[in-house]
Amino acid sequence: MSDFSQTVPELVAWARKNDFSISLPTERLAFLMAIATLNGERMDGEMSEGELIDAFRHVSQGFDQTSETITIRANNAINDLVRQRLLNRFTSEQAEGNAIYRLTPLGIGITDYYIRQREFSTLRLSMQLSIVAQELSRAADAAEEDGDEFHWHRNVFAPLKYSVAEIFDSIDLSQRVMDEQQQGVKDDIAALLNQDWRAAISSCEQLLTETSSTLRELQDTLEAAGDKLQTSLLSIQDTIMNNPHNLEFVDKLVFDLQNKLDRIVSWGQQTIDLWIGYDRHVHKFIRTAIDMDKNRVFAQRLRQSVQSYFDNPWALTFANADRLLDMRDEELTLRSEEVTGELPPELEYEEFSEMREQLIALVEQALHKYKAQQIPLDLSEVMREYLAQYPRSRHFDVARIVVDQAVRLGVADTDFTGLPALWQAINEYGAKVQAHVIDKY
């Protein structure tokens, strides 16, 4: 979790005072990544000037540059990376002229983005979420203990701040890399279709299928772990509310982690929805191109036949056959079973948006009696009754609809007292709601 304690003017003055600047042309960036790759093979994490020159020689060969001035250009490149604080140079009086070099945190961060962050896989995500689950579980257990403020700092705040938050940031960064990779796939598909769409159909289909499969696997992994992580965070939050110590710093961190987790989980579903739309667009383009090309080829052949009739006479025979109806659905969801998964039988022919509209209408009608008869509305009891009628996967959506409709009816007098409402369970899976009884319509 990134926290900025300095103000914008302070950061600007700091950057100006230290003369920070980064300029990495393609050659310099390739050199930096070569250093990081070779450095990863060394136990001490240090490289000599000769090893850096050897790395630069590989880069120079890759860019087809002359080998006559390699030493001079390598020294210039090394000095440039040192000046930009991407490399640290260490010298000693005992070994004068034999400096050693280490990558700075900035250099590691840049190379990590270009090299390691692109290794985003379901296995890596599963391992990260597993570590987060263990840390959150330990933090929740520590929160249950009756400890002082130092105990909360050491056993709750520290793991959340320096382990869970950093892994969340790593997952968030990886998702942003996935966004770039999807854009790269779109560019590849566009290039294939512009060159020769006939030959590109199978390649486009493979790219679309692989990306859809990857997104679905990642989303399944996120959804499987999301509920457990959110439960641990809610447990810590409940403990904070009942603790006499001033734990606002922990409460704020937990709130930030909840928002981060929500963004991470929602990213997957949103990305899948956008990719389905793009998938349809590509297939519709291919179908249109096939139809247009078919007509264009026929028209071209007919034109040539008419022009060469006297050289090659021909006869036209036609039959009035029964018309064949094209039953293809232009709006067919392509590979929906692969992208969105199989629906249960009772929902097979229903869209979620239609279900949501129907549910809103039913809830609105059911809650109207409270306003008409001036009956106090206990939100926890109403939500408990509704959630019992639906599977667990729909509880969040149903609860949100019930709350949206309930708050439109009126407010609670006790809201104006400033006293917090009690947390009350609304299902068997640990979900709770905090709301006063609505009695003023």
Swiss-Prot record:
Q: Which Gene3D superfamilies match?
A: Chromosome partition protein MukF, middle domain, MukF, C-terminal domain, Winged helix-like DNA-binding domain superfamily/Winged helix DNA-binding domain
Record keywords: Calcium, Cell cycle, Cell division, Chromosome partition, Cytoplasm, DNA condensation
Localization annotation:
Cytoplasm, Nucleoid
The Gene Ontology biological process terms listed for this entry are:
cell division; chromosome condensation; chromosome segregation; DNA replication
Q: Which domain of life is it from?
A: Bacteria
Record InterPro entries: Chromosome_partition_MukF, MukF_C, MukF_C_sf, MukF_M, MukF_M_sp, MukF_WHTH, WH-like_DNA-bd_sf, WH_DNA-bd_sf
Q: Which GO terms describe its molecular function?
A: calcium ion binding
User: Assembly state and interactors?
Assistant: Interacts, and probably forms a ternary complex, with MukE and MukB via its C-terminal region. The complex formation is stimulated by calcium or magnesium. It is required for an interaction between MukE and MukB.
What the protein does? Involved in chromosome condensation, segregation and cell cycle progression. May participate in facilitating chromosome segregation by condensation DNA from both sides of a centrally located replisome during cell division. Not required for mini-F plasmid partitioning. Probably acts via its interaction with MukB and MukE. Overexpression results in anucleate cells. It has a calcium binding activity.
The record's similarity note reads: Belongs to the MukF family.
- Name-wise, this protein is Chromosome partition protein MukF
